[in-house]
Amino acid sequence: MAGRLRVALVAGEASGDILGSGLMQALRARHPEIEFIGVGGPRMEAEGLSSYFPMERLSVMGLVEVLGRLPELLRRRKRLIRTLIDARPDVMIGIDAPDFTLGVEHRLRQAGLRTVHYVSPSVWAWRQKRVLKIREACDLMLALFPFEARFYEEHGVPVRFVGHPLANTIPLQADRVAARERLGLPLDGQVVALMPGSRGGEVGKLGELFLDTAQRLLGERPGLRFVLPCASAARREQIERMLQGREPLPLTLLDGASHEALAACDAVLIASGTATLEALLYKRPMVVAYRVAGLTYRILKRLVKSPYISLPNLLAGRLLVPELIQDAATPRALATTLSPLLDDGSQQVEFFDAIHRALRQDASAQAAEAVLQLVERR
């Protein structure tokens, strides 16, 4: 492809900044004469993006917070659309953050520009009618998972399965001994990772439950040890408060280091979320648990169309890992379900290995190829 390319990218959160920077590297490797404009974080800026405003202005979580910032978000989106239409990039790529980026993509596509969306929203699980908006908004969807690609194909949306970047980052075989040495854990004996989530609300719902489960497991298996990676200082303080007044537990709290914890452990008790994909890629047998407010659960039960909540089961297309939700998630049930996996989790591990290899596609390279092919079809 000859000539200079102008590529617009819009990311709204840290995970999108990581994906965006990898995509920018892969695009430049294939087409050195390239200019990047749009909105991104420090990683994308380090790759040469001229960001129109700080990405953090789009990073809003929670309904109340979104409502409080809605006038600013709408104003920024309107200005961004106008700026990008004037700039006439060869292609615009929205990275995740669908509530913001899909609106931008839709307006740019109406103005005759090529648009791509990188990372599918969970339309296959709930609010499936959003696929109609996606079909109008983008020329191409870049999907991280094969079941997402199948969903879009069924709904007439051009899609390319590119794999997941973590599948290339995480080795096919993690070194458990080296991880334990780095964490100062004994090399013999079994270790269970407790991962109750990264947000305060999740830890509030699951932290005590996971600690109670650990106490039960310890009663059955006196030599067991536990590690719990804390996503932030606030989460560590939250867990430390929960530990006060409890019977002593052979538990190591870690600052971050969730990947080290997964590499070091023999099995995982884990909140439903993206961390379950990381546990799968580390080939660690797991039990998934989740609790939300009662009203939220009743609403989600009506809206969610998927039979599973965890990525390992969605990727396997069957109930591969146990999911204990709401009232079913009790210390006794979790301990009873997890304990056999410490003796033999090979069935899960075999599937995890096959899934890891399927996702190991070099996502950034695949995404870059798909974007450039779209541009060539002008």
From Swiss-Prot:
GO cellular-component term (any): membrane
Pathway: Bacterial outer membrane biogenesis; LPS lipid A biosynthesis
InterPro entries assigned: Glyco_trans_19
Pfam families, per database record: LpxB
Domain of life of the organism encoding this protein: Bacteria
GO biological-process terms attached to the record: lipid A biosynthetic process
Protein known as: Lipid-A-disaccharide synthase
